[in-house]
C-alpha cells in the first residue's frame, strides 16, 4: 500500500538542524530513509497503476507468478499453504486471493495428485493466456524503470538494499498492545 509522503523531502541541512533538537536524529540515515521510502512508494504506485489497468492486484499477480514458476519446474503441486508461505502472507489472505483468481477463471483448485486430502492450485489456460499477454509489457516497464542505472549500479543497489533489509530484523516495531515486536524480514504485498 502506498505511503503518504511529502512532495518535497527535507534538505540535508534541515535534518542537520533538527539533529540539534533531537540528538538521536542521524541526518544522513534519515535522508537515505526518506529517499528509500519515497522511491519505493513511487515504484509501487507505477506498478500498481499498471496492474489495475489490467484488473489485477499486486497480491493476485504474485500468486499467478508463483504458479507460473510451478509450471516451469514440472509437476510439483502448490497448495494454498505453500503459496501463502512463498508469498509471505497468511493462509486466510491466500484463500481470498485464490478465491478471486478462481472466480476470474485464472486458477482452479484440484485434488492434489499426491495427497487426495489436500487441494492444489493450478493455472488455467485463461491464466496462462493472461500472463503470456501481460508479462512482455510488464518486463518492458520494469526495464524502463531501471534504465537510468548501469549494470554495475544495479548490482550495487541490490547489494545495498539487501544490507538495509538485513537491518530490519533488529529494529523493533510497536505492536498493537504497545510492546515491541520484530519487523518482518520479508515485505508483504496484498491487494
Could you describe each region identified by the protein language model?
Residues 1-24, 152-191:
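C-terminal regulatory/oligomerization modules of transcriptional regulators
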Residues 80, 98-99:
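Short, hydrophobic-biased segments on the C-terminal half of alpha helices
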Residues 27, 37, 45-89, 172-178:
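N-terminal helix-turn-helix DNA-binding core of bacterial DNA-binding proteins
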Residues 99-159:
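Charged, amphipathic alpha-helical coiled-coil/dimerization segments
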Residues 31, 35, 62-66, 129, ...:
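Pre-recognition alpha-helix immediately N-terminal to the DNA-recognition helix
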Residues 1-54:
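N-terminal leader segment of winged-helix/HTH proteins
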Amino acid at each position: 500500500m502506498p505511503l503518504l509522503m511529502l512532495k518535497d523531502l527535507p534538505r540535508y541541512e534541515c535534518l542537520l538542524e533538527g539533529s540539534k533538537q533531537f540528538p538521536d536524529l542521524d541526518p544522513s540515515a534519515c535522508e537515505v530513509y526518506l529517499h528509500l521510502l519515497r522511491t519505493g512508494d513511487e515504484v509501487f504506485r507505477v506498478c500498481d497503476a499498471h496492474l489495475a489497468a489490467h484488473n489485477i492486484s499486486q497480491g493476485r499477480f504474485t500468486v499467478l507468478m508463483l504458479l507460473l514458476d510451478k509450471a516451469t519446474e514440472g509437476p510439483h503441486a502448490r497448495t494454498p499453504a505453500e503459496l501463502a508461505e512463498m508469498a509471505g502472507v497468511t493462509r486466510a489472505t491466500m484463500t481470498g486471493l485464490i478465491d478471486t483468481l478462481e472466480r476470474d477463471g485464472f486458477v482452479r483448485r484440484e485434488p492434489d495428485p499426491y495427497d487426495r486430502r489436500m487441494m492444489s492450485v493450478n493455472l488455467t489456460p485463461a491464466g496462462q493466456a493472461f500472463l503470456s499477454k501481460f508479462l512482455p509489457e510488464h518486463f518492458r516497464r520494469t526495464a524502463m524503470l531501471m534504465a537510468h542505472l548501469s549494470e554495475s549500479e544495479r548490482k550495487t543497489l541490490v547489494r545495498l538494499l539487501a544490507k538495509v533489509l538485513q537491518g530490519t530484523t533488529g529494529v523493533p516495531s510497536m505492536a498493537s498492545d504497545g510492546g515491541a515486536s520484530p519487523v518482518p524480514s520479508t515485505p508483504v504485498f496484498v491487494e
